[in-house]
Amino acid sequence: VWCSGCGIGIALYALFEAVREMGIQSQLCVFSGTGCTGKIAECLNVSACSAGEGFAVAAAAEWRRKNVQSKTVVFINNADILLTGASDIIESAKNQDDLVVIIINNLIYTLSEGRAYPLTPFMRSSAVFGVDLPFNIPYAAHRAGAGLIARWNPMRAGWMRHTLIDALSAEGLSVVEMVSPCIVFRTDTKEILGPVERMSFLNDLSEIRYEKPSRDLDLRHPGKIIFGGFAPAEGKGESDCHDR
């Protein structure tokens, strides 16, 4: 379903390993958003729904309120965040919805299938070649009020499994970011490597550091990419969630 080495399948594997260990298969409900993450709901033999562009978190939150015993997980990507401005995540955090939101950060903010998705603050047109991040995802999640925040890469499926066990056991909103650059996006520049080489390259740029302040986790900053579970920034509030 997904390209070899794509982090979506690995994140899904980590989720099902967590669910199997917890024995909550019958309670699980999975929602998926736009793009490649939208394929997730089509492939599962559990309660699942592909909610369409920009509606996955809101639909999952509504489902969870009506089905209080459900363990509800949402898979979204960068396009979903840009479509809503993260307003659905902010609203779920304010309402203390028991959701686990898994964000596949594929580092793409350009045209997809001929359609222009919402733009980053750094480009006038999505047709302009470039890769930029609109905001620091862990910091934005903390400012919105999420209780559990983590970031992993595809080489850390075991760590992500443990994080998801904690998230599925926690109350309120949990946000887990999977940094997995899209491999198809690099084919036009002839920079694509094999799956193992790609994941190893990303892993070599990574460092695991727990409880690091979320404001220091912007991927645009030089140095290692920090993975782990993170400490909240000072204070929280939806009005500041787009601080960069």
Where do the language-model regions lie?
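Short coil/turn connectors at secondary-structure junctions
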Residues: 24-28, 67-72, 94-100, 104, ...
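Glycine-rich beta-alpha junction loops
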Residues: 34-36, 106-108, 156, 179-185, ...
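Flexible, low-complexity linker and terminal segments
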Residues: 180-244
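Conserved thiamine diphosphate
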Residues: 116-166
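Thiamine diphosphate
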Residues: 34-109
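Short acidic, glycine/serine/threonine-rich loops at helix termini
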Residues: 41-44, 84-88, 111-116, 186-191, ...
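Active-site diphosphate/adenylate-binding microenvironment
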Residues: 1-52
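ATP/pyrophosphate-binding catalytic subdomain of soluble kinases
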Residues: 148-186, 195
